[in-house]
């Protein structure tokens, strides 16, 4: 009795089994420079814009840049601390956004506009 060999299908490499050293890791300096640029863009938005909504959006950009810096540092030192700090920053950003939007709605309801300069005229 003659047995025929079983044909095997050759496995093709997937993303999970591909060589991770093809592109190499992103240097920590590049990630921190990107975070600093994003933070500076947010800071310029806070300093230049007088609309309350745009100021809130700029604050969110700044908090995202801080989170990116923690993620980059954590991945550089192979530590989960950066990811944990990012979760804290994300939670803080959500609380800041909800409180900021509540203040924004009340401000718009009372004033009819979102100009921050007129907030100095508010009375207690």
From Swiss-Prot:
GO cellular component, one term: NADH dehydrogenase complex
Keyword entries, A-Z: Cell inner membrane, Cell membrane, Membrane, NAD, Quinone, Translocase, Transmembrane, Transmembrane helix, Transport, Ubiquinone
Database matches in InterPro entries: NADH_UbQ_OxRdtase_chain4L/K (IPR001133), NUOK/Mnh_C1-like (IPR039428)
Superkingdom of this protein's organism: Bacteria
Subcellular location as annotated: Cell inner membrane
One biological process term in Gene Ontology: ATP synthesis coupled electron transport
Membrane topology: Multi-pass membrane protein
Catalytic activity entry: a quinone + NADH + 5 H(+)(in) = a quinol + NAD(+) + 4 H(+)(out)
Family: Belongs to the complex I subunit 4L family.
Record's subunit section: NDH-1 is composed of 14 different subunits. Subunits NuoA, H, J, K, L, M, N constitute the membrane sector of the complex.
Name the record gives this protein: NADH-quinone oxidoreductase subunit K
Organism: Psychrobacter sp. (strain PRwf-1)
Gene: nuoK
